[in-house]
Swiss-Prot record:
Keywords from the named record: Early protein
Organism: Vaccinia virus (strain Western Reserve) (VACV)
Family (UniProt): Belongs to the orthopoxvirus OPG024 family.
The keyword Ion transport belongs to this UniProt entry's keyword annotation: no
S-S pairs: none
InterPro entries reported in the protein's UniProt record: Orthopox_C10L (IPR009748)
Stated name of the protein: OPG024 protein
Sequence segments annotated as region (Disordered): 1-60
Gly residues composition bias: residue spans: 31-42, 49-60
TM spans (from-to): none
Stretches of the chain forming a coiled coil according to its record: none
Domain of life: Viruses
Taxonomic classification: Viruses, Varidnaviria, Bamfordvirae, Nucleocytoviricota, Pokkesviricetes
Amino acid sequence: MSSKGGSSGGMWSVFIHGHDGSNKGSKTYTSGGGGMWGGGSSSGVKSGVNGGVKSGTGKI
């Protein structure tokens, strides 16, 4: 899965589906889309959404 080029939206979908039933922050992942960079854990949700969006967008 080395698609760091432009299919970021697709990666969000995968993560959203993966965490949709696992964690309660499914909506947060969807809105921020930084869950994948944050780590995916409960503590990584907020840090992923807040920091992952900016750092993630920059890396993309």
